[in-house]
Amino acid sequence: MKAIVVIDHAAGSAGLTLTDRREPSAAINDVIVQIHASGFVPTELEWSSTWTDRAGRNRTPSIPGHELAGVVTALGYGTTGLSVGQRVFGLADWHRDGTLAEYVAIEARNLAPLPGDVDFTVGASLPISGLTAWQGLFQHGRVQAGHSVLAHGAAGAVGTMVTQLAREAGAYVIGTGRAADREKALDFGAQEFLDLDNDALEDVGGVDLVFDVIGGDVQKRSAALIRGGGTLVSVVGPVEARPADGRAVDFVVEADRAQMGEIVQRVRDGRLRTNLGTTASLDDAVAALNSTERRKGKTIIIVRP
């Protein structure tokens, strides 16, 4: 099968290579999925799991990419809840070969049914951004109606999901980003927008929840804005700053079939829109993933047109 692999950690995205790999086989509780579309997060080339297995051993050449939508072609022993020929989408294990390939072996629990009226491209755009927003807001952030949410990166793939889900929950959303992000952030539902290059973050005043996708100085300044009992939620590693009278949580997103079902149903209902950016074929993926242009939305690789 065709696959994108990485070997040299230091090379970054420049080290991505299109090659031929043996098709995977299904282990116990695994499913083989013929991939139609794959999502890719540029920062995953910085994650240790891209390069090593759970025991810390080098596993290169490895296949990156962790989001997928496709069709089940084989079931491993003990697999339940899915069937051959079924349309699915999901989130691949961090420490196994990923989804920038024609086929992937993936645990069945990491997949959810993809309804026939949802395009594979849309399905592949949902797992990381949708689950990150869902888990950050509801499991870790405990967002409630009437809360104020400061959503950093509000025009990005995660930020637009955070904004929409927070608004649906009855929260007031203040989005941040660069000046060029204002229109998109407001279009996806932010009620206010702050230009981090030109506006004073402190002018936001107190908020109940900060959803941080940036870290560093922005995280530290944001922590100071959190009201008593509020929460700082970070997806960029260990929290460096904590609110004076509140909680700070950092987490790594996990696959959850029920949550993916909730997310895709909202897409079907029109309550949730995806933020699609660049799309490219698997043959053109290396060039697309090495583009120097600023990414505008989720990058999706069309594996099977």
How does the language model describe each region?
Residues M1, M260-P305:
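C-terminal hydrophobic helical "lid"/dimerization subdomain
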Residues R22-F40, W51-H95:
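Glycine-rich beta-strand-centered segment in the early N-terminal region that forms part
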Residues G90-G153:
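NAD(P)H dinucleotide-binding glycine-rich loop of Rossmann-like/cofactor-binding domains
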Residues L126-D195:
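Mid-domain Rossmann-like dinucleotide-binding core that forms the NAD(H)/NADP(H) cofactor-binding site
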Residues I174, K184-V249:
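Glycine-rich cofactor phosphate-binding loops and adjacent beta1-alpha1 units
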Residues G228-T278:
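Rossmann-fold dehydrogenase core element
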